[in-house]
């Protein structure tokens, strides 16, 4: 049996909490290549030793409970237990630590983000001995990565399907997000697509409401896609939101989209759930549909610095579960996102191999072992004046999505789309000529205004619009 431990009362927690550190705090442990590694930002209750808290996190997220039980003797805890193998004080924070925990791979079902999260971010987050707990990062070993399908297609296959290379893709979320009839909604999509955008998008809360049922929306949007394609000679798409009350209904909507011949559908992966998302990603891979992922609800989970789950973990989970696009913030728009932190998890979404880099919040080296990449989507409060910064920050393998920044154009949707496309092409050309967009971006946009009245009108409307607030979640 595992060694019995003394139950004692201590400051900050009630009698009956045992000393986890005797079994689960192992600073001499040598990490295995197959271990799943977690970095937790941990704030103990006053009087609780950090070693005890780190061990408690390891125990309660793996094999442990609050007392020794006789059935411990029926298995090998040394083989299956999580281990807190390192503690690191957080600079500038009193009584806060990064606890590093190693989990044996055998604790987790193959190919299941749901099972992975149920253990690692489960009941332990309500543990009384902890004032706060946040999962900052996960290292997914190659042996576990290979049990997942990952993105249905990935960045390169998407570009091949769309026949679009050498620039970011352009999108637009249709507004108002709720209340339009299906026919008017389809017309708004058509105007944006014929104006030069690659995609339009359902808002995350557009499902199948009384004012616009899903089947009607799918039909009118498909008409908009095909009409704009025939006029422009470019492949177009619209993120048809297949999120539904049940998995069965979700897959029915996906099947109807395939029947219509549209190239891409959409899912709200956090509100819809990882099980549903993985099922939908498998359907998309089998049926040639691209899958756009919205992160609605993420800020409830990731925005607080001391408690919850950092978005880089949610992004890794999405890459495992499956998605071709994922919203990732803008750095410069209306939504939360520090530059270096954002670039850190954008690389984790797109690249094959990412080195540990604490300056960008990357706690572990991550090898995706040739799993397809996820295209980051920059969306939220952006307009034409942001185009140079967005092009410079996100690079070519990204989708820049302007909702109000397209539909708010004084001349209408199509001129708004023209303005965005002209601004993007001007920025890409300037970058390819070797110009510094960070320094010369505004000059590039002003020069393009001289031969694009649509862009000039957009620049005039949004010349004073800025979202300059301090980021809450900093390194």
Swiss-Prot record:
Residues carrying N-acetylproline: 3
Binding sites annotated in the UniProt record for Mg(2+): 201, 203-204
EC number(s) stated in the UniProt entry for this protein: 4.1.1.39
Keywords assigned by UniProt, alphabetized: Acetylation, Calvin cycle, Carbon dioxide fixation, Chloroplast, Disulfide bond, Lyase, Magnesium, Metal-binding, Methylation, Monooxygenase, Oxidoreductase, Photorespiration, Photosynthesis, Plastid
Superkingdom field: Eukaryota
Catalytic reactions of this protein: 2 (2R)-3-phosphoglycerate + 2 H(+) = D-ribulose 1,5-bisphosphate + CO2 + H2O; D-ribulose 1,5-bisphosphate + O2 = 2-phosphoglycolate + (2R)-3-phosphoglycerate + 2 H(+)
Coiled coil: none
CC cofactor note: Binds 1 Mg(2+) ion per subunit.
Site (Transition state stabilizer): 334
InterPro entries named among the record's database cross-references: RuBisCO, RuBisCo_large_chain_AS, RuBisCO_lsu_C, RuBisCO_lsu_C_sf, RuBisCO_lsu_fd_N, RuBisCO_lsu_N_sf, RuBisCO_lsuI
Propeptide part(s) removed at maturation, as residue ranges: 1-2
Cofactor: Mg(2+)
Other facts noted in the record for this chain: The basic functional RuBisCO is composed of a large chain homodimer in a 'head-to-tail' conformation. In form I RuBisCO this homodimer is arranged in a barrel-like tetramer with the small subunits forming a tetrameric 'cap' on each end of the 'barrel'.
Function: RuBisCO catalyzes two reactions: the carboxylation of D-ribulose 1,5-bisphosphate, the primary event in carbon dioxide fixation, as well as the oxidative fragmentation of the pentose substrate in the photorespiration process. Both reactions occur simultaneously and in competition at the same active site.
Complex formation: Heterohexadecamer of 8 large chains and 8 small chains; disulfide-linked. The disulfide link is formed within the large subunit homodimers.
Protein name: Ribulose bisphosphate carboxylase large chain
